[in-house]
């Protein structure tokens, strides 16, 4: 059993497991070398050998307790035939916004997305058995925001959901994406993932009622269906920006773990920790600092607050491309040595 899986079952006062969201990627010089051997980001995602190499790079360098497969939440819509492009390498958006009715008729192109599962299989065979392998997906609502451009509550398109009577179409589309998401996660589990995480990056833009219907309901469906098939698999939810709704999300979705963003206060995480494993929530901007004392103080504060119960140390969002390697090394050292210094 991996150290991360152990953390789900009971608190380990002698060790706190650690991994980082987006730990495989642009901040690593070895990743930049690998990236130059492909023509695009998606080409790298769909090359099992190279995706596996990217996945294992941060394990080799930092000895994290888990590998997370090098992929993207947008491989799902891409495999549905929706061409996703990264504008200025930052903002992913559909090249042509599909009609919602057309989206509901879309079918998965297995020749594309199966490459992700091949990469997982390769990684699992190479990865130390004491380390977990994390598969992941985007929450159906978040994936839909990228497909349709509802990425900001202030954009007219968000308000069109109600003003143009699109609510039922949105719900139907989320239901379709939920089915595809369940299949995608199940295939990652079958390929070798022992943990899966659901990234709902745009959960926080939703009002209460829509949060319940667009985020909680499909996530609950995903968790229930996967648990029926794979009761041993651990599922982490990440409703970024949900604030006080983290509690509602945790209670009603039945996730095994909750990943918390950096805006959530530690006392709120402590409350969550009474019922579920918590993960997080160091601000990625903090580890850009040239002042190691600032980083150390932030890490120790989180560890002092949360490490005596079910807890995985992580960031409150993905690691930034400009993050200094030495700062990551410092954090890993602080977390791994924390209990021995008590």
From Swiss-Prot:
GO cellular component, one term: cytosol
Residues that bind substrate: 22-26, 41, 72, 146, 201, 317
PROSITE patterns documented for this protein: UROD_1 (PS00906)
Record-listed E.C. numbers: 4.1.1.37
InterPro entries: UROD/MetE-like_sf, Uroporphyrinogen_deCO2ase_HemE, Uroporphyrinogen_deCOase
SUPFAM superfamilies in alphabetical order: UROD/MetE-like (SSF51726)
Residues carrying the site annotation Transition state stabilizer: 72
Record localization: Cytoplasm
Pathway connected to this protein: Porphyrin-containing compound metabolism; protoporphyrin-IX biosynthesis; coproporphyrinogen-III from 5-aminolevulinate: step 4/4
Catalysed reaction equations from the record: uroporphyrinogen III + 4 H(+) = coproporphyrinogen III + 4 CO2
Disulfide bonds listed in the record: none
An example molecular function term from Gene Ontology annotations: uroporphyrinogen decarboxylase activity
Record Pfam families: URO-D
Biological process (GO), any one: protoporphyrinogen IX biosynthetic process
Keywords: Cytoplasm, Decarboxylase, Lyase, Porphyrin biosynthesis
Protein function: Catalyzes the decarboxylation of four acetate groups of uroporphyrinogen-III to yield coproporphyrinogen-III.
Self-association state and partner proteins as the record states: Homodimer.
Family to which the UniProt record says this protein belongs: Belongs to the uroporphyrinogen decarboxylase family.
Protein name: Uroporphyrinogen decarboxylase
Organism encoding this protein: Orientia tsutsugamushi (strain Boryong) (Rickettsia tsutsugamushi)
């Amino acid at each position: 059993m991996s150290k991360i899986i152990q953390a789900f079952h009971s608190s380990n006062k002698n060790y706190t497991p650690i991994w980082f969201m987006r730990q495989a990627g642009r901040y690593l010089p070895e990743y930049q070398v690998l990236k130059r051997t492909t023509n695009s980001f998606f080409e790298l995602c769909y090359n099992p050998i190279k995706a596996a190499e990217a996945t294992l790079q941060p394990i080799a360098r930092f000895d994290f307790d888990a590998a997370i497969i090098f992929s993207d939440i947008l491989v799902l819509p891409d495999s549905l035939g929706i061409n996703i492009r990264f504008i200025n390498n930052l903002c992913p958006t559909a090249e042509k916004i599909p009609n919602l009715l057309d989206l509901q008729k879309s079918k998965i192109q297995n020749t594309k997305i199966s490459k992700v599962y091949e990469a997982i299989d390769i990684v699992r065979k190479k990865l130390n058995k004491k380390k977990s392998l994390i598969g992941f997906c985007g929450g159906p609502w978040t994936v839909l925001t990228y497909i349709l451009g509802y990425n900001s509550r202030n954009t007219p398109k968000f308000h069109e959901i109600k003003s143009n009577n699109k609510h039922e179409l949105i719900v139907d589309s989320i239901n379709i994406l939920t089915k595809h998401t369940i299949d995608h996660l199940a295939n990652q589990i079958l390929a070798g993932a022992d943990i899966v995480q659901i990234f709902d990056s745009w959960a926080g833009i939703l009002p209460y009622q829509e949060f319940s219907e667009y985020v909680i309901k499909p996530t609950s469906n995903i968790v229930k269906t996967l648990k029926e098939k794979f009761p041993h698999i651990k599922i982490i939810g990440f409703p970024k920006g949900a604030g006080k709704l983290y509690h509602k999300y945790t209670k009603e979705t039945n996730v095994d773990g909750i990943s918390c963003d950096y805006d959530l206060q530690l006392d709120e995480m402590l409350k969550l920790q009474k019922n579920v494993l918590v993960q997080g929530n160091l601000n990625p901007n903090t580890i850009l600092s040239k002042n190691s004392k600032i980083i150390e103080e932030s890490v120790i504060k989180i560890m002092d607050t949360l490490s005596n119960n079910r807890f995985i140390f992580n960031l409150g969002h993905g690691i930034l491309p400009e993050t200094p390697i030495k700062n990551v090394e410092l954090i890993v050292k602080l977390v791994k040595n924390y209990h021995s210094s008590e």
